[in-house]
From Swiss-Prot:
All copies of domain ATP-cone, residue ranges: 5-92
Descriptive protein name: 2-phosphoglycerate kinase
GO molecular function per UniProt: ATP binding; kinase activity; phosphotransferase activity, carboxyl group as acceptor
Cofactor(s) required for function per UniProt: a divalent metal cation
Keyword Transcription found: no
Enzyme nomenclature, EC number: 2.7.2.16
Catalytic activity: (2R)-2-phosphoglycerate + ATP = (2R)-2,3-bisphosphoglycerate + ADP + H(+)
Species lineage: Archaea, Methanobacteriati, Methanobacteriota, Methanomada group, Methanococci
Keyword DNA-binding assigned: no
């Protein structure tokens, strides 16, 4: 790559060309409208060119962006930008996006990942497929059903069979989910995990209490709107709309159950009507969690400015 005409950003173990797009994405995640974020990214670029800066340390770039935002009266955006850049650069964060089938966990997870620059998004359906490779049908038959049909293979029918089947199905998948969380925290890798198997009351408390783990539950309160999501999904994917509609009442039971368990565990519930609004609400929730993480470490804004990425 010919870097002679680029401004080079230098990290601790790498160098890369200054990217207005990456900076604009970071500013958007911090709360700026995309058009304003890109304009400020251009301003920063032009400022560096005017000063004839050819190589800039990443921490110095972060400091310049922070103070430029302050100078433009974007104080809250500046604080969020600083928080995100420091945390994502140095600390792992695991974001869990739960919700019943059809509420949009995949869409929201990928939107958040794009905003924050988190490269890894894992669906619990994928983890379920891995678990099926190592656990036989005879041992856990519910694992081989869908979340809303697991009740069919229960060996007893005490209580609400639909919810009990869902719980048995999810428990096996959560074993794999917890393994992924452990691995990411140990290796310092950020990840977003999304899916219907993320049941708050079935996940170990040590994960819910970990400041590096953020759990958000999505829902759609209106039944008709929820049902319309399946029709819309069927037009753009190969997923069988008829099957979802056949078990829609059970899916709604699971939706209500997941919202109830989230509230019981103090996990924020976000209704997913408009994607942009949902993403903004989720980012605000994640930001508040990260503030708690930083407070526990006793770091001030000045500390964050000085700490290299």
């Amino acid at each position: 790559m010919d870097l002679q005409n680029d401004i080079i950003v230098r990290g601790k173990s790498y160098e890369m060309p200054f990217s207005k797009g990456i900076l604009a994405r970071s500013l958007t995640a911090a709360g700026l409208k995309p058009s304003i974020a890109y304009r400020i990214a251009w301003d920063i670029y032009e400022m560096l060119k005017k000063e004839n800066i050819r190589v800039i340390d990443k921490a110095d770039l972060r400091r310049r962006v922070y103070y430029y935002l302050i100078s433009k009266n974007y104080d809250e955006v500046a604080k969020k930008y600083l928080l995100w850049r420091m945390v994502l650069g140095r600390r792992p964060i695991v974001i869990l996006i739960g919700g019943a089938s059809g509420v949009g966990t995949s869409t929201i997870a990928f939107e958040i990942a794009s905003r924050l620059g988190i490269p890894s998004v894992i669906g619990t359906d994928s983890i379920r497929e891995v678990m099926r490779k190592v656990i036989s049908r005879d041992l856990i038959p519910t694992l081989y059903e869908s979340s809303y049909t697991a009740w069919k293979v229960l060996r007893d029918d005490e209580g609400n069979k639909y919810i009990k089947g869902f719980e048995r199905h999810s428990e096996a998948v959560l074993t794999g989910v917890e393994g992924v969380i452990d691995r990411c925290l140990v290796e310092g890798q950020s990840v977003i995990i999304e899916g219907t198997h993320l049941v708050p009351t079935l996940l170990k408390d040590k994960y819910l209490e970990n400041s590096h783990v953020v759990f958000i539950m999505l829902t759609i309160y209106n039944e008709e709107l929820h049902k319309m999501r399946f029709y819309a999904r069927g037009r753009v994917s190969s997923r069988p709309t008829e099957r979802y509609l056949k078990y829609f009442k059970i899916i709604r039971m699971i939706n209500d159950y997941m919202v109830e368990t989230a509230k019981k565990k103090g996990i924020p519930v976000v209704e997913n009507i408009k994607i942009s609004e949902t993403v903004d609400k989720c980012l605000n929730i994640i930001t508040e969690r990260l503030k708690t993480m930083i407070e526990l470490e006793g770091l001030s804004e000045e500390d964050m400015l000085e700490e290299g990425l």
